[in-house]
Amino acid sequence: DWELIAIDDHSTDLSCKILSEYQKKDNRIKVFKNLKNGIIDALRLALEKSNGSYITRMDADDIMANIKLEELIQLLLKHKKGHVATGYIKYFSTNKKLNDGYLNYEKWLNCLTAEHSNFSEIYKECVIPSPCWMISKSDLIQIGGFNTNTYPEDYDLAFRMYYGKLKVIGSKNILHYWRDYPERTSRTNPVYSNNTFPKIKINYFLKNELNQKKMLLLWGAGKKSKAIAHLLVQNKIEFSWITNNPKKIGKTIYGRKIFNCNTFEVPENSQLIIAIASKSFQPILKLATIKDTYRFC
């Protein structure tokens, strides 16, 4: 059995009217208006109104595979509580060509899902597709539900799943078709800009991973690493900044000198944040042996 909780978040088309007609025909469909504003408030309202033991969500403009709900619920029934179920996703667009960024994300995400290893790269990018997961309601409430005001809300939820010790179980079937279009909220709303990603990563890193007894190294001197360095400085975190980019070696940014990673003496007891987005990135042996390493790109 199932129930559909549809939240009208100030829509300007006929969505609410159409849903209301379906609601009259099927009492499993329930429509509510979001009296506040935005996705987080809509999610809170939906969870509050839900009666089921398992929760999943998706956006109204996407398409789920016919087998999606059955596939996800069977995974959870088999593995019990303490798990989040997900599956392959596929991007599509009806009015534009998909760019490489979305296609690369789709491939990367599906590869992680195939191995149930999504959380192994939690600091790179959001590792749980926001419209393609299912979790027991009790587990969702235990990790805080939708009670935080942190954006991107899907990435924040993925971090809370990870630090809530949930395990990923993935289906190798395409369960969700994810629409991309120019007016998509993640494209138009500044809370989803790339500028918000370093902040959420650093916040969770400082709260859960930073070891004051180890030297923290930041490797990289590009745009993303500068954003991370700025956040570390703002939080008064001691770190050493290294790069193999000859144009950046010796420069001082945010009051921090950038050292040559090839000649920098790396303490045995170190933590390493790698913030290098280049596809041609090659690890240096003395840094590759640092076990306490976090890939931020």
Task: Label each region the model flagged.
Residues N34-S50:
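Glycine-rich, basic loop-to-helix element that forms the pyrophosphate-binding segment
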Residues Y88, V168-L175:
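Catalytic beta-strand/loop signature of glycosyltransferases that borders the donor
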Residues N173-Y181, R187-Q212:
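Catalytic core of nucleotide-sugar-dependent glycosyltransferases
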Residues D8-K17, D59:
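A conserved acidic beta->alpha catalytic loop
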Residues Y151-L157:
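Acidic donor-binding loop at a coil-to-helix junction in glycosyltransferase catalytic cores
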Residues Y88, L103-E125:
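Short, flexible, basic/aromatic active-site loop/helix in glycosyltransferases
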Residues I67-Y102:
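Conserved donor NDP-sugar-binding/catalytic core segment of glycosyltransferases
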Residues I55:
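Short aromatic/hydrophobic "clamp" motif used to bind/position activated sugar donors
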